[in-house]
């Protein structure tokens, strides 16, 4: 990393004039967040734009877009709003932590609060949020939504915040009420649950990360619409139930060479095991469905040389490249943002081939 750079990597940014979403390379410095356009796997200089952090406010998690639950919102001193999407909850929280640190540099009390926050949201490795939600939907042992009343209004198919905390503990997903609240907050952040009614919506607006979910018998929640599987064909049924049923092992933004036009585009890659698949998503699209993917059974993965443009790579793209050859001899050319990131992906994929 260059001198003075606090963090760098891909984020998906909402456009100012046309509200489309595009992947940009972001570089965080002490008081500035720069973002660059990419062409041929390389960032184009000068930067496409810069966000001055002095006087900025940050909202994380930002729930303004239902289909984009991993957002950070920055509001500058001049009230310009930036919406930035990360590839995972961990990466979003890492960016939010570093950006908040850059905003509050020179205020030790704020930095100490940040360190407490950073260490408070850890999901145990043996627990999958998808598994928790599946169990919640179980007709015999799950949590049963029912009509609930709040301030004179009746909300159908809801459950109480305190009831969910009770259920998480009784189902052995959490050992204490504090742990259960943390888990419930994660489920809400990842768009599996949503708040309903005045009490729970008010907690979201308070902006306090530690108090997003309320262990309260007056706070109402429901399953988010995004959890309901929209199935329109036999092909989609087989894709969602088999390929996408595995446990997520790793995810992140990588550049990929297209098969037909050979152009390079940033995609969000998700590596799953049991069954072993590597899928990739178009981060500019709203729907959370892969645009491609392949089974890793019988695949080969290897790093490509860093000196010059390797064989099979189109354009002047070089550095941090690796290749996956599938069982049916399809070649995928992928570029990481650093040697370390490339090594991590290769190691993770090799374990599943």
UniProtKB/Swiss-Prot annotation:
Tissue: Ubiquitous. Most abundant in the thymus, large bowel, small bowel, stomach, and prostate.
Modified residues (Phosphoserine): 120
Keyword Ion transport listed: no
Main location: membrane
Keyword Cell membrane recorded: yes
GO biological process terms, semicolon-separated: actin cytoskeleton organization; intracellular signal transduction; positive regulation of cell projection organization; positive regulation of plasma membrane bounded cell projection assembly
GO molecular function, one term: phosphatidylinositol-3,4-bisphosphate binding
Alphabetical keyword list: Acetylation, Cell membrane, Cell projection, Cytoplasm, Cytoskeleton, Membrane, Phosphoprotein, Repeat
Record localization: Cell projection, Lamellipodium membrane; Cytoplasm, Cytoskeleton
Topological type in the membrane: Peripheral membrane protein
GO cellular component terms attached to this protein's record: cytoplasm; cytoskeleton; lamellipodium membrane; membrane; plasma membrane
Domain DEP: 139-225
PTM annotation (N-acetylmethionine): residues: 1
Matches recorded under InterPro entries: DEP_dom (IPR000591), PH-like_dom_sf (IPR011993), PH_domain (IPR001849), Pleckstrin (IPR037370), PLEK2_DEP (IPR037369), WH-like_DNA-bd_sf (IPR036388), WH_DNA-bd_sf (IPR036390)
Domain PH residue range list: 4-104, 247-353
SUPFAM superfamilies: PH domain-like (SSF50729), Winged helix' DNA-binding domain (SSF46785)
Function of the protein: May help orchestrate cytoskeletal arrangement. Contribute to lamellipodia formation. Overexpression of pleckstrin 2 causes large lamellipodia and peripheral ruffle formation.
Protein name: Pleckstrin-2
UniProt organism field: Mus musculus (Mouse)
Lineage: Eukaryota, Metazoa, Chordata, Craniata, Vertebrata
Gene that this sequence comes from: Plek2
């Amino acid at each position: 990393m260059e001198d003075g750079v606090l963090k760098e990597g891909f984020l998906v940014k909402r456009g100012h004039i046309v509200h489309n979403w595009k992947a940009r390379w972001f570089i965080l410095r002490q008081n500035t967040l720069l973002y660059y356009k990419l062409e041929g796997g390389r960032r184009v200089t000068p930067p496409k734009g810069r966000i001055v952090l002095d006087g900025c406010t940050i909202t994380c998690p930002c729930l303004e877009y239902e289909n984009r639950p991993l957002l950070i919102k920055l509001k500058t001193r001049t009230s310009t709003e930036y919406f930035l999407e990360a590839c995972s909850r961990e990466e979003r929280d890492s960016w939010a932590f570093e950006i908040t640190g850059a905003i509050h540099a020179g205020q030790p009390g704020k930095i100490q609060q940040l360190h407490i926050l950073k260490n408070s949201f850890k999901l145990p490795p043996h627990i999958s949020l998808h598994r928790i939600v599946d169990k919640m939907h179980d007709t015999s042992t799950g949590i049963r939504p029912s009509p609930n009343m709040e301030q004179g209004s009746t909300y159908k198919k809801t459950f109480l915040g305190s009831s969910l905390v009770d259920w998480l503990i009784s189902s052995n997903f959490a050992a204490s009420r504090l742990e259960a609240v943390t888990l419930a907050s994660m489920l809400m952040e990842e768009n599996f649950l949503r708040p309903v009614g005045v009490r729970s919506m008010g907690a979201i607006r308070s902006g306090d990360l530690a108090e997003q979910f309320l262990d309260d018998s007056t706070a109402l929640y429901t399953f988010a619409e995004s959890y309901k599987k929209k199935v329109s064909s036999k092909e989609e049924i087989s894709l969602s139930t088999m390929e996408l049923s595995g446990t997520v092992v790793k995810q992140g933004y990588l550049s990929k060479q297209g098969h037909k036009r050979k152009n390079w585009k940033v995609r969000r890659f998700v590596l799953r095991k049991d069954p072993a698949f590597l899928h990739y998503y178009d981060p500019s699209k709203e729907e959370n469905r892969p645009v491609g993917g392949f089974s890793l059974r019988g695949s080969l993965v290897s790093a490509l040389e860093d000196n010059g443009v390797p064989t099979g790579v189109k354009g002047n793209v070089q550095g941090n490249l690796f290749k996956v050859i599938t069982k049916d001899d399809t070649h995928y050319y992928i570029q990481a943002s650093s040697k370390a990131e490339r090594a991590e992906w290769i190691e993770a994929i090799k374990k599943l081939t």
